[in-house]
Amino acid sequence: MTSSSSKSNKSRKSSKAAKDTTPVHESASRPLSKTPPPFRNHIVDKRGLKQLVAWAYKNHGTAVTSSMADKLKDLGFRYATQAAVSISVNDLQVPEAKKALLGEAEEQITATEERYRLGEITEVERHTKVIDTWTETNERLVDAVKKNFNQNAPLNSVWMMANSGARGNMSQVRQLVGMRGLMANPQGEIIDLPIRTNFREGLTVTEYVISSYGARKGLVDTALRTADSGYLTRRLVDVAQDVIVREDDCGTTRHIVVEAEDGRFGNRLVGRLTASQVVSAVGEVLAERDTEIDPPLSKRIEKAGVTAVSVRSPLTCEANRSVCRKCYGWALAHNELVDLGEAVGIIAAQSIGEPGTQLTMRTFHTGGVSTAETGVVRSVVAGTIEFSAKARVRPYRTPHGVNAQQAEVDFNLSIKPVGKGKTQKIEITNGSLLFVENGQTIDADVTVAQIAAGAVKKSVEKATKDVICDLAGQVRYEEAIQPREVTDRQGNITLKAQRLGRMWVLAGDVYNLPPNAQPVVQGDTEVTEGQVLAEASQRSEYGGDVRLRDSIGDSREVQIVTTAMTLKDFKLLEESTHSGEIWNLEAKDGTRYRLNTIPGSKIGSGEVVAELADDRFRTGTGGLVKFAPGLAIKKARSAKNGYEVNKGGTLLWIPQETHEINKDISLLMITDGQWIEAGTEVVKDIFSQTAGVVTVTQKNDILREIIVRSGDFHLSSDSKALERFEGDGHMVNPGEEIAKGLSIQDMKYVQTVETPEGKGLLLRPVEEYTIPNEAQLPELSHVKQANGPHLGIKATQRLAFKDNELIKSVEGVELLKTQLILETFDTTPQMTVDVEKAPDKRAKTISRLRLVILESILVRRDTMSDSSHGSTHTELQVEDGISVKAGDVIATTQILCKQAGVAQLPEATEADPVRRLLVERPEDTTTLSTSGKPVVAVGQRIVDGELLAEGDPSSCCGEVEAVDSNSVTLRLGRPYMVSPDSVLHVRDGDLVQRGDGLALLVFERQKTGDIVQGLPRIEELLEARRPRESAVLCKKPGTVEIKQGDDDESLTVTVIEADDAIGEYPILLGRNVMVSDGQQVTAGELLTDGPINPHELLECFFEDLRSRKPLMDAAQEAIANLQHRLVTEVQNVYKSQGVSIDDKHIEVIVRQMTSKVRVEDAGDTTLLPGELIELRQVEDTNQAMAITGGAPAEFTPVLLGITKASLNTDSFISAASFQETTRVLTEAAIEGKSDWLRGLKENVIIGRLIPAGTGFSGFEEELQKEAGPHPDILSEDPAGYRRMQNLRPDYTVEMPPAASSTAVLDDPSDADLEATRTRHNIDPSASNFAAFARPDADNELKEEQVVDAEAVEGLQEEGLLSDD
């Protein structure tokens, strides 16, 4: 009932007070509690109010509480009005301390930036430190705000509002009067520029923009959260809807243990029933089994020093498909034992789902892990540090880049004071950080150590960050880095740093050379401004005639004609039509070719240049193609371009006209089989082109097509002939007799057709087309270079159709095309051919077609210099129209020096030529004069502040180039720290430009607990999701041994188990081992860091217990372990967000998730292997097997997520209404399932009364037990009587009337019984008592039967009882 809103001491005091503060008004109704309310005088804040109302409700009922709440409201408004509490801008007081705090933070950050500049810390360490600094400053500022209000204006309205819990909280007040703090960018990374101002002072433009990122995120977050939370509730309700309290006591002895946290139970025991005696430390019995624990008893148990209490819980309840009252405990609505028929499942689901909207309000994390979790210890005295004898430490570098030591064991550290005084002792725990050495002398108030808070196993993740170069120059490694090459499985080689070390970039002007440029200067030579540093030339590949084109953009194109071919015998003519230009080639004999491309375009090899314009092979209509013997075509891969003719011959063509129609049959104007003349209208608006016999194809009253076959029609009765030409028909040669008295002069195609007049033969005309063996080729002349690609043209004939192909068409088609096709040999596929129009050499008016292959070379323009390129100068070495040979230089480009200096070249290798060169300019070096003799040597690298000579610190970083008696010359540079295992992108001696990536730092950052927290985390737990990279879990208990793998990266953890068996666990790269050599581990313990896979955990528990215990016990215990874990995890998420939910709600849901087992081996039972079934059912089945001696079923417990559990419920109606409706219903139908309508959902869907509350079926039975048989027994009721719904408890009639008219109220005679038996077909072996008497609750206790006068009277009136 309580909620923790403010943690200040004052509210604690007031809450104590508020528990019994109730000045209840006299006029209120009679109090339920006998104790008079005590009087307390205290500040009441939100928490106090909550407790006050709760107290009133508990002790005095609803009415009193509501009237009291009303009075409190009036009180509040009245005094708020009198006090004139309002808010104005002046109430937002910014604390004085803010300036100083920000100044301090700035100083720390400047120092950090300086350390980064000097290469003492890596980029990651700098970022972490900056973020942590700001986070800490923000925290301190909040304290300053609190302090300021508390001391100077405790009645400030903003402060009162936030502090009392009325509205708002400190984090919001902080933004009003403190500072807005760090913000995340849209990717969720923290921007290391915090918003220093608050809303009172106003934000700068930059801050405003940064700030609005966060605001938008909040809005989107809220919208999404509502949807997610609703869906979560729906799934929860679905999984738990059939959990109803169905019995009073299941009688189980199983229980769960609730342990005290810091000696306190809080509210965790209240409302539970004890599972066994609770005995205090001194042996006093505090509570017997099944005692309800109320707050006073809970307090007494706490006071008696009891640390663990075993209580009954829904998790261990053995009621079938439900929970019993005693295991559930109090219904939290009215703090009394839960009623029968209460739908606790739905209440649980809503209790967990509803706060979902409050979760993840504060999703993003404020930055690096705050160091507040670990306690910093400072020295009290000045003295000498001494470690105790067993101390073991190893060097450690903190996330802020401070070198320290980490303790490997627990030990004591003492500081012995220099003079008199007490020795300071500090207990150092394993994992703590020490900032001092053994034997070191320190001053007072120095940070000595950071004590690790317990064995906090934080999960870490690998993250990477790029190191970007800030200046151009040459890379130099320090010795310390020790780079090594690592080859991965794909054979890629990466360079990795092995140790922490610096990488230097020494300044210089770096020139990027264009491709194929060669340096023309030597290394270490002086160069002047404008001098040529490198030269690149562009050469022709094949040679040929040069054409210079006008420049396009920033480059000029030089074209070299390598091959050209002119079609000499053809004139190129241009015709204009309304659809555009058409180009034709005309031969001397007047044949024309249509050009498929237009001059100025490009074509590739194998494409058609032109087609013969020829009407000889054009048909009048569609028809049937037949090849005469001898005509052959090439097989083509696709018929898109037709089939090439291999060998000429004759092609036969049988014309037929086909109209494709697809219209309604009512539009048909002729009949099937009719002979029509040319020009007949066959369908509305469609006319036949030829005369002939019509065939109509239709389907479902839709006209598909109409075919007109021309020819001569002869009615014939010659059945042999008709049969011969049935179907497709065939060719008949001239002079052959077709039927009696019918022979032909020309070749015909004969077919049998049916017409309205009768059957007959249709003699269809055949057209012959002669196809030459090969197409004639026009004369070509072409020029070919000595080694250029070859060009040619070949003429081919292509048939558009295969043998026997039917062409459905009304217009004619082109049967044969003669095409000119371009051929190029020995070429690259990318090569294209340009089509050009060229004037004839002799007659200038005539144009010819010319095909050329061009080599195109783009020549760069001159460019001015920029930061990474020198200025370039390009000269053409050729003129228009001259001829060049292959390999001749067309143009040269020179790279010119920007500024005088000394040129340096990196070493070139075969594999990689020189791509960059460096010029060391005068401003890249500096000479520092020293007062004394320098103490540095040439080649040494120096950072700011290092001494050059006695008393002369250096003012810049760099490498010593020369040393004189009183001066030092430095080449300026910049150090970058790289951490171990970083990937190095550059090698020693490489040249880099500003902005290049130098390395990829690999670092571990602690997973911020809130990446997966709030709703997603709850969902992850309840859906029992398998995490992507889960931790390695130990399967059996034993002792750990850690072995190094073959390569230095891989590890194997072996666990030596009790029976000397050895379990091996290979550890993947990048995983941190959480155990140490020789440590004892238990089953299910983490061997590496990472999220836990709950399924794997259950398996570990079960496997381990299975070896020591019977199957059933092992399953129950493994499930119990997992249940406990799940409940705790879910609670942790809600607690971290300040939401309090009673454990029992979570337990009800977890119970549903863990209620099933998977059958592995069915034994002699009727179960199926692999089937999911309730643990209880298997238990019952196996007990039956034990009695009959059959083999029991083997099974393993399973954990189902809420969605899975909902779909696996016994009721298919409920499952189908949840998700995957079709699948669930189909399966149920195939398996022939029955739904027993046990849950609420099934009943609601079908429209029955739900079995909860007053519809709870247990109540019917109770009533029936009390009421006995109903007197209005219908004579046709076969088994004696029917129990009616409207049972009236005032009837006490025991016996049904006898067969005769006289009713006998004592035991009936045998004859009567016999008669009744025969009348009702009752088996004579059934006992008389069972058949006729109402079974009592207890047969031994016979009730005294009193005749009820009214009842007898009623029976007599109805003629069921004689008057005597």
Swiss-Prot record:
Keywords: DNA-directed RNA polymerase, Metal-binding, Nucleotidyltransferase, Transcription, Transferase, Zinc. GO terms for cellular component: DNA-directed RNA polymerase complex. Zn(2+) binds at residues 250, 317, 324, 327. One of its GO terms (biological process) is DNA-templated transcription. The lineage of its organism: Bacteria, Bacillati, Cyanobacteriota, Cyanophyceae, Synechococcales. HAMAP family: RNApol_bact_RpoC2 (MF_01324). It is an enzyme of class 2 (transferase). Its cofactor is Zn(2+). Pfam families: RNA_pol_Rpb1_4 (PF05000), RNA_pol_Rpb1_5 (PF04998). This is DNA-directed RNA polymerase subunit beta'.
